[in-house]
């Protein structure tokens, strides 16, 4: 799925996966959860990068980060509450950092392949 598609549409199976993760039954809040998923995707892609269109396809870390961000947004959506709210888990940040590392490596490989002219290059 292209990055453009990830930022504009949510497939029914992706919505169901998030609802299962958030332990949400029924379809009463599907529109809100879909919006939270799109927002999570935009945030994650913005942090990681958008030069490699297929990077997020079948990427478990991306899927898991979307689940975590959506779960956090869903459970902390009432901003007028006196109840204690929590920051997003370290697991989310670790997952984002792992994706950033993978992404930078893929960009480096792609750039190296484009610039390869048969001679050794100094990568420093």
Regions found by a protein language model. Name each.
Residues 1-124:
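Divalent metal-cofactor coordination and adjacent catalytic microenvironments
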